[in-house]
Amino acid sequence: MQKDIHPNYQEITATCSCGNVIKTRSTVGHDLNLDVCGACHPFYTGKQRVVDTGGRVDRFNKRFSIPVGKK
């Protein structure tokens, strides 16, 4: 490795809005504030909601479909 060309790799803390503090290493150089983390993200906590778009698609198709026997 060449000397004096690599960024400074140091320990930082990433603080989530839920209060979770994560210690990691990065070249950013300052502490980070996160909006979501693995402790509060709905996908990882199991609180994820499934949006039912089937009703909307069916309603659109029914409204804008052309009847078969009509010209």
Curated annotation (Swiss-Prot):
Oligomeric form and interacting partners: Part of the 50S ribosomal subunit.
Database matches in Pfam families: Ribosomal_L31 (PF01197)
Keywords, sorted A to Z: Metal-binding, Ribonucleoprotein, Ribosomal protein, RNA-binding, rRNA-binding, Zinc
Cofactor (UniProt): Zn(2+)
The protein's name: Large ribosomal subunit protein bL31
Species annotation: Sodalis glossinidius (strain morsitans)
RNA-binding found in the keyword field: yes
Residues noted as binding Zn(2+) in the record, renumbered to the chain: C16, C18, C37, C40
GO cellular component terms, A-Z: ribonucleoprotein complex; ribosome
UniProt similarity note: Belongs to the bacterial ribosomal protein bL31 family. Type A subfamily.
Record GO terms (molecular function): metal ion binding; rRNA binding; structural constituent of ribosome
Species classification: Bacteria, Pseudomonadati, Pseudomonadota, Gammaproteobacteria, Enterobacterales
Gene name linked to the record: rpmE
Cofactor, free-text remark: Binds 1 zinc ion per subunit.
